[in-house]
Curated annotation (Swiss-Prot):
This is Glutamate decarboxylase 1. The modification N6-(pyridoxal phosphate)lysine is found at K405. It comes from the Eukaryota. The lineage of its organism: Eukaryota, Metazoa, Chordata, Craniata, Vertebrata. GO terms for cellular component: cytoplasm; presynaptic active zone. Keywords: Decarboxylase, Lyase, Neurotransmitter biosynthesis, Phosphoprotein, Pyridoxal phosphate. The modification Phosphoserine is found at S78. It comes from Bos taurus. It catalyses: L-glutamate + H(+) = 4-aminobutanoate + CO2.
Length: 594
């Protein structure tokens, strides 16, 4: 705290005091309250509270009111407020003559570092503000060749010699300028959308810490956060809090791959040392609507894509259990060994939920590993209203759950949850002596890195943990319920309009709403190969116009023999009914002349 100069009366009354300490002690309530005003709100209130113990009620009220008024008058985002000695105040700085070598750890580099980072924060805050501003574009689209050739001083080529910090700041601005604002309320293109401010703060701090998740030794708090959060997620799935395991991975595709590795190790542990040649010819089962990562994992892990058997789905995209059992029996008759079934809770395109209870019955009957890919639908477990759609998930051996989708956590944040403790460790452990020494001074069971197939592992947990603390489980529940309500609103708005046609009948189970826009030229035209071919070209044309205008973004795709259709997904808590209305109007505007 800064020292205060006592008044003359105070000086006379302290004539016999120690001259080395007298001037360090403010002697009036006003002086002390001035000191309190320079502190954080929490500490300042404590100081004021201490002063009030022997003061009158009138004086107490005056002191606290003065402190609160002073605190509330401060601009919380002001750099002038961050340090009372002014080190973090913005000053005019000529960055054209400054380079990376002038920043910390350079000698006398603190001031330049502060000014540079304040400029970066200014860029970031402007971007955040514009992201939530509906009058701004979702994207400023340019073709690859335009960006590669350079845009108004924005050059992607790397140079041999250092460029000034002024140019680096320009590059920071332009990188955001020409990117896509995935947090914009009218961005509906992917399953991962939104820009959560608490999560953003967590990611800033994560990058600043710049640590690795392989041992407690170098990431003590993050390792404990991960264990606590994974335990909570397993409980929400419906497993015993004492059992189970899990780890955060780079994404749902890797989490799904972990599940196949765990299943293979559980039934055939010798594969770890002897390879696939030592085990029978194994087959995996997944639905024809499941995520392509199951086939990709089959290829990467040595099963081969021919041994990833696709199960038929009904018109809503759900696995037909009878076809699963038929294909299991067919595989056994051909000499294959069925190993693993993947059920999807929230398919990528239709948002369908496979009948997990019936699939679990079949897996138990034939002793197969059941995995539930709830990358997209796992968030619904947080909702008392919607979690019934994942009924039976507690019977799974493993679950993929991506908080970076429905829960709005910033990319990347995916978890693989395993019901049986020890399988991930046994499957992946290599006991690298330079990392996982058994004779450390702490409990080495907290060195979780050997469960992962990676060595270096990004800290994905902090932003998620911080968001959960800020929102609570109830906050996530409300957020998810709102997104599903918006999907119901969209469905109700277009289902009976002649310019739209639903891909399948019935209300959506998830926030996926799949539909065709029918231009005037195709309305009332009977179904035929020619009409389907023309309809197939409608969605891509509208999407191209949409991107050129930059007003909104929504995805499209074919499915089976169906022509290209729009797949609307809602996972951004910032979206409202007005944004849904805008999307419909924009599709009509862009498609009216097709």
């Amino acid at each position: 705290m800064a020292s205060s100069t006592p008044s003359s009366s105070a000086t006379s009354s302290n004539a016999g005091a120690d001259p080395n300490t007298t001037n360090l002690r403010p002697t009036t309530y006003d002086t002390w309250c001035g000191v309190a005003h320079g502190c954080t709100r929490k500490l300042g209130l404590k100081i004021c509270g201490f002063l009030q113990r022997t003061n009158s009620l009138e004086e107490k009220s005056r002191l606290v009111s003065a402190f609160k008024e002073r605190q509330s008058s401060k601009n919380l985002l002001s750099c002038e407020n961050s340090d009372k000695d002014g080190r973090f105040r913005r000053t005019e700085t000529d960055f054209s003559n400054l380079f990376a070598r002038d920043l910390l750890p350079a000698k006398n580099g603190e001031e330049q570092t502060v000014q540079f980072l304040l400029e970066v924060v200014d860029i970031l805050l402007n971007y955040v503000r514009k992201t939530f501003d509906r009058s701004t574009k979702v994207l400023d689209f340019h073709h690859p060749h335009q960006l590669l050739e350079g845009m108004e001083g924005f050059n992607l080529e790397l140079s041999d010699h250092p460029e000034s910090l002024e140019q680096i700041l320009v590059d920071c601005r332009d990188t955001l300028k020409y990117g896509v604002r995935t947090g914009h309320p009218r961005f509906f293109n992917q399953l991962s959308t939104g820009l959560d401010i608490i999560g953003l703060a967590g990611e800033w701090l994560t990058s600043t810490a710049n640590t690795n998740m392989f041992t407690y030794e170098i990431a003590p708090v993050f390792v404990l956060m991960e264990q606590i959060t994974l335990k909570k997620m397993r409980e929400i799935v419906g497993w015993s809090s004492k059992d189970g395991d899990g780890i955060f991975s780079p994404g749902g595709a890797i989490s799904n791959m972990y599940s196949i590795m765990a299943a293979r190790f559980k039934y055939f542990p010798e594969v770890k040392t002897k390879g696939m040649a030592a085990v029978p010819k194994l087959v995996l089962f997944t639905s024809e609507h499941s995520h392509y990562s199951i086939k990709k994992a089959g290829a990467a892990l040595g099963f081969g894509t021919d041994n990833v058997i696709l199960i038929k789905c009904n018109e809503r995209g759900k696995i037909i259990p009878a076809d699963l059992e038929t294909k299991i029996l067919e595989a056994k008759q051909k000499g294959y060994v069925p190993l693993y079934v993947n059920a999807t809770a929230g398919t990528t395109v239709y948002g369908a939920f496979d009948p997990i209870q019936e699939i679990a019955d079949i897996c138990e009957k034939y002793n197969l590993w059941l995995h539930v890919d709830a990358a997209w639908g796992g968030g619904l477990l947080m909702s008392q209203k919607h979690r019934h759609k994942l009924s039976g998930i507690e019977r799974a051996n493993s679950v993929t759950w991506n908080p970076h989708k429905m829960m709005g956590v910033l990319l990347q944040c995916s978890a693989i949850l395993v019901k049986e403790k020890g399988i991930l460790q046994g499957c992946n452990q290599m006991c690298a002596g330079y990392l996982f020494q058994p004779d450390k001074q702490y409990d080495v069971s907290y060195d979780t890195g050997d469960k992962a197939i990676q060595c270096g592992r990004h800290v994905d947990i902090f932003k998620f943990w911080l968001m959960w603390k800020a929102k609570g489980t109830v906050g996530f529940e409300n957020q998810i319920n709102k997104c599903l309500e918006l999907a119901e609103y969209l469905y109700a708005k277009i289902k009976n309009r002649e310019e739209f046609e639903m891909v399948f009948d019935g209300e959506p189970e998830h926030t996926n709403v799949c539909f065709w826009y029918i231009p005037q030229s195709l309305r009332g035209v009977p179904d035929s190969p020619e009409r389907r071919e023309k309809l197939h070209r409608v969605a891509p044309k509208i999407k191209a116009l949409m991107m050129e205008s930059g007003t909104t973004m929504v995805g499209y795709q074919p499915q089976g023999d169906k022509a290209n259709f729009f797949r609307m997904v809602i996972s951004n808590p910032a979206a409202t009914q007005s944004d849904i209305d805008f999307l419909i109007e924009e599709i009509e505007r862009l498609g009216q002349d097709l």
